[in-house]
């Protein structure tokens, strides 16, 4: 999975995979999480849900609330090219997403004053971890992270033992924003099977 991460900017995404078990060519079978370095840690929320609310007008932040009692806003920053952060294809006044949430790893470098979105050790898309396939990527160009389907787990954490995968999805793993940079959101630039035969 290619993202645009570099040493001071990781926006991790959790990778989910599916086998087309029923053979109908649709992603309607079981999704399996590819576990990463934060899997099973107490600060990782495995049953996270966040609801986003339509803003009252263009250029406004998007309010959110979650199933942990948290609430906040996705800021509308001047560098956004679109009028709304809220998806325009969703007609409802709110929508809810379900997934896994990692603890934010954002901090200010005291020596430079720069905001750093720190990396997690391994196992996430758009993350500057030990499993990246390319060098330092100082300019934030496309850079690969390698994944192994042997890391696919059932909901109870046991190995899924998948033989192959037919579908892949990536879920932003952080619910965090900074005033300067905006929301931490995973960028996926490409996907490829590196073991295709």
Which stretches of residues belong to each language-model region?
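A short beta-strand element within beta-rich, extracytoplasmic domains
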Residues: 1-7
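Short coil-to-beta strand junction motifs in C2/discoidin
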Residues: 7-13
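Eukaryotic short linear interaction motifs
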Residues: 8, 23-25, 41-43, 176-178
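Predominantly extracellular/luminal cell-surface or secreted proteins
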Residues: 16-20
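Acidic, glycine-anchored loop motifs typical of Ca2+
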Residues: 21-30, 48, 52
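Conserved hydrophobic ligand-interaction patch in extracellular adhesion modules
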Residues: 32-35
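Low-complexity, serine/threonine/proline-enriched polar segments
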Residues: 37-138
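Ser/Thr/Pro-rich, low-complexity mucin-like regions
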Residues: 138-197
